[in-house]
C-alpha cells in the first residue's frame, strides 16, 4: 500500500537546500509504487526561484496544487520528509524524518540536537554532518530544580550522498577568456566560502603570468544589483593587494545558469582546475560536480567534501591537491544564533599552502606530470560516477525513508525463530 508522504522544502529555489529537496523528490519519484507524494514548498532566504519550464517543474506545480486541496479537505500524511535546518523540524505526520545538510563547523547548536531528537530519524548529506551531530554534547543546570541537564543526540542519523548528474548534450559556452590557463571557483559570497582568500592567494601566486581565475558567484539573487555588488567586492579585494602591472586576470561569472550550463562549465576546454578552500561544507556540491566532471581539485581535506575527495579505504587516500589548514574559532561576524554557535570552529586554509597547491596543479597540467592528481582526474571521475550513481543514491535514500533495513532485520529475526521452532 502506498504511503502518503509530504515533502517540505525549498524545492523551487536555486539554493543548496533546493538541490537537496529536488534530490529527495527524485528519489521518491523513482519508486512510484511506494509513495503518493505531496509537496509544501519553502522559500530559502533571498535566493532566486527556478524559472526553467521542464516536465519536472510542471509536475511539481501540479503536485503543490494537489497538496493544497488535500490539506483543505483534512487529509493526513503517513510520513513527513522535512528538508531544512533542524531547528525548523516539526511534527507533521505519523512518522517524521528530518533531512538536513547538517553543519559546516565542529559543533552543532543545542537547538539542533533537541530538534533532531524529536524526529523519528534524520538523514544527512555527509559523514561530517553525521559525526558532528552525534558528537555534540551539552550540559547545564535546571534553573528551577538545580539538577544537571545533559543533551546529546538520541535519534538515528544516516548518510546519503548526492548522486552524479549525467546529460546527453551540454551547451557550448562562450566564455571569452584570453588567458592560457584558468582556475575555476564556484562559491556564494560570504564568510564561509572564503572567496576573498581564494582571490588573494591566486593573485599573489600568479600576478605576472598569463593565468585566469573564473569566479562563479552571487550574494543571494542573480539580479543586476547583485552582480554589481559582487563586482565591487572583488575589485576591493584586488585593489587591497596593491599589485602593479598584473598580468593574471579575475573573471566574474554571474547570473542564472542551468544544471546543463554548469556542467558545461566544468568540462569547458578553457577551464583547467577547480580551487575551493571553504571554511566548511555540509557536502560541497560544486566541488563534487567538478570532481566527477574530471577537473583536478585543489581544496582542504576537512568537512563534507571528504566523502568524495578521499578513497574510503584505510588510511584514506586523497584524490586532490591537499591544502593544509588549521581549525580555529568561527569569527563573531559569522555566528548565527541557533545555527552557528560561539564555541564552534571551522577550517582556515593556510595561504602559503593554497598557493603551493595551486602552483603544483598548474605545473602538473602544463608538464603532463605522470601519477599526478591532475592527470588522474578523469580516472577518478569514472570511479565517482560508479560509486555515486543515481540509481544507487536513489535506492539508498528510499531505503532509509521506508526503514528497509529495519524491516529486513525483523524478517530475519522471524525466520530465525521459525527455524528454531522447526
PLM ranges: what are they?
Residues 1-76, 212, 395, 422:
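N-terminal pre-catalytic "stem/leader" segment of glycosyltransferase-like enzymes
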Residues 6-9, 176-193, 199-202, 213-215:
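Conserved donor-binding/catalytic core segment of Leloir-type glycosyltransferases
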Residues 6-8, 46-132:
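Extended catalytic core of nucleotide-activated donor transferases of GT-like folds
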Residues 121-169:
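Donor nucleotide-sugar binding/catalytic pocket of nucleotide-sugar-dependent glycosyltransferases
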Residues 224-265, 272-273:
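Nucleotide-activated donor-binding/catalytic signature segment of Leloir-type glycosyltransferases, i.e.
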Residues 345-356, 366-399:
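A charged, aromatic-enriched C-terminal amphipathic alpha-helix characteristic of glycosyltransferases
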Residues 359-367, 390-422:
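C-terminal alpha-helical cap of glycosyltransferases
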Amino acid at each position: 500500500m502506498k504511503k502518503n508522504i509530504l515533502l517540505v522544502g525549498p524545492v523551487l529555489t536555486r539554493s543548496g537546500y533546493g538541490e537537496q529537496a529536488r534530490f529527495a523528490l527524485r528519489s521518491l519519484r523513482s519508486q512510484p509504487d511506494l509513495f503518493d507524494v505531496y509537496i509544501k514548498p519553502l522559500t530559502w532566504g533571498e535566493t532566486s526561484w527556478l524559472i526553467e519550464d521542464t516536465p519536472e517543474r510542471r509536475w511539481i506545480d501540479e503536485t503543490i496544487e494537489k497538496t493544497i486541496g488535500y490539506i483543505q479537505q483534512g487529509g493526513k500524511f503517513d510520513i513527513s520528509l522535512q528538508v531544512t535546518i533542524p531547528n525548523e523540524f516539526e511534527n507533521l505526520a505519523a512518522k517524521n524524518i528530518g533531512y538536513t545538510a547538517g553543519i559546516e563547523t565542529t559543533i552543532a547548536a543545542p537547538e539542533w540536537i533537541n530538534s533532531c531528537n524529536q524526529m523519528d530519524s534524520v538523514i544527512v548529506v555527509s559523514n561530517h554532518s553525521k559525526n558532528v551531530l552525534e558528537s555534540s554534547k551539552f550540559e547545564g543546570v535546571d534553573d528551577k530544580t538545580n539538577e544537571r541537564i545533559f543533551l546529546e543526540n538520541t535519534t538515528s542519523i544516516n548518510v546519503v550522498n548526492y548522486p552524479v548528474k549525467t546529460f546527453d548534450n551540454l551547451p557550448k559556452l562562450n566564455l571569452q577568456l584570453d588567458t592560457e590557463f584558468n582556475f575555476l571557483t564556484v562559491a556564494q559570497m560570504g564568510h564561509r566560502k572564503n572567496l576573498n582568500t581564494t582571490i588573494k592567494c591566486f593573485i599573489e601566486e600568479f600576478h605576472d603570468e598569463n593565468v585566469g581565475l573564473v569566479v562563479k558567484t552571487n550574494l543571494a539573487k542573480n539580479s543586476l544589483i547583485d552582480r554589481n555588488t559582487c563586482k565591487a567586492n572583488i575589485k576591493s579585494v584586488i585593489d587591497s593587494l596593491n599589485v602593479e602591472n598584473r598580468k593574471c586576470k579575475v573573471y566574474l561569472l554571474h547570473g542564472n545558469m542551468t544544471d546543463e550550463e554548469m556542467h558545461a562549465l566544468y568540462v569547458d576546454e578553457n577551464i583547467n582546475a577547480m580551487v575551493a578552500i571553504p571554511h566548511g561544507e555540509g557536502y560541497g556540491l560544486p566541488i563534487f560536480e567538478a570532481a566527477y566532471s574530471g577537473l583536478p581539485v585543489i581544496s582542504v581535506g576537512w568537512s563534507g567534501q571528504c566523502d568524495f575527495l578521499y578513497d574510503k579505504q584505510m588510511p584514506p587516500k586523497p584524490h586532490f591537491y591537499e591544502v593544509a589548514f588549521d581549525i580555529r574559532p568561527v569569527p563573531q561576524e559569522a555566528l548565527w544564533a541557533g545555527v552557528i554557535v560561539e564555541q564552534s570552529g571551522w577550517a582556515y586554509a593556510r595561504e602559503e599552502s593554497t598557493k603551493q597547491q595551486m602552483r603544483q596543479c598548474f605545473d602538473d597540467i602544463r608538464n603532463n606530470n605522470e601519477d599526478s592528481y591532475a592527470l588522474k582526474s578523469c580516472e577518478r571521475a569514472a570511479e565517482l560516477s560508479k560509486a555515486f550513481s543515481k540509481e544507487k543514491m536513489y535506492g539508498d535514500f528510499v531505503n532509509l525513508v521506508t526503514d528497509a533495513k529495519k524491516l529486513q532485520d525483523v524478517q530475519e529475526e522471524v525466520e530465525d525463530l521459525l527455524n528454531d521452532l522447526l
